[in-house]
Amino acid sequence: MLKVNLSVPLRFPPRPSALKKMTQPIPPITLPPPENPLLEGEWLRERLQRWLDTEFIPEAVNQNIAQRAAQIFVRQRMEGENDLGSLVIAIVTEMQSYDFSNSFYGEFAIANAVSDLLLESLGIDKCCGQ
């Protein structure tokens, strides 16, 4: 027998104007050219380790993870990469070879955390890109 939950509101298809907004590409977020990539890397390492330690529990492996992510970030920045999306992809790709077996985290969580920290530093809302 089919049961219908009447407490759930009916969902209608979005209006054409809303649908058009949903199909618009998300504009890229570009970081300013690096003035001191090593200093940026140290800032990122410290912030990422603090985030890792706060998110679950402080672990020795968090320092290694933050150091590795910061190294990738610095190298990418020194090679001229300023696009946030490309930086995130580079971190995901290169962190895949990292052994996360002693951690609660994985490469996607690390790349997303880096993205959030960078957006926050730029004053961009993580939720809505504004």
Predicted regions and their residues:
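N-terminal chloroplast transit peptides
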Residues: 1-22
